[in-house]
Amino acid sequence: MSAYLEVEGVEKRFGDNWVLRGIDMSVNEHEVVCLIGASGSGKSTLLRCINLLEKVDGGCITINGDRITDIGVDVDDVRREVGIVFQSFNLFPHMTVMKNITIAPMRVLGQRKNYAEAGAMALLERIGLAEKANEYPDRLSGGQQQRVAIVRALAMQPRVLLLDEITSALDPELVAEVLNIVRDLKEDGLTMVLATHEMGFAREVASRVCFLAEGVVCEEGPPEQIFSEPATPRLQGFLRRIIEAGRL
């Protein structure tokens, strides 16, 4: 059986800077794949390419058998299948929490307002923020804003959720409340691809871990293999630095 998400030989450059140099990666349904690697290794760019926020310069990406990188593909159709959450929240500051969550289901999915709001409230209740439905983002903590950003993505009922360093902009004491949501989504069986610097969390939740360096997947495997028996000098050096920094 073929993977639900296939990334084959994907290349991306910005000017003379090749950020992705031939990425190969597959994700099966219900898997949680964690992308690890130093800053600048291409993790965020890869996620943006999968969501079609960036156009690839080579290779192809396939979702559920359809090549989404072909010319003429409907971007909105792809983003119905593939949600993304950014490290900087990206909530609309002039909209309430409820409006932030319901605007896309109403405009893109054609949901009626009452239906979209009922779904949004159910999601907010699940993450313990129902009382914040009519607040504006600047009235929320960073952790609360990120939880709302995750709910906003979930309101579109994606088949795959991409999470781009979702804790990197948070104070340490707020990280746990966001990671707990990801744990719950894993229990639900949602297919996810996470770029993360939270090595302990990656070890806990990942089905597989992909280590990126200089725009390629240098090593991949189950978390115990990646973190306990790294095979390549690059990964060994990366983990050594992580351990020395007290992050694993």
Model region roles, listed by residue range:
Residues 3-7, 11-223:
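ABC family nucleotide-binding domain
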Residues 213, 224-248:
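C-terminal boundary and immediately downstream tail of ABC-type ATPase nucleotide-binding domains
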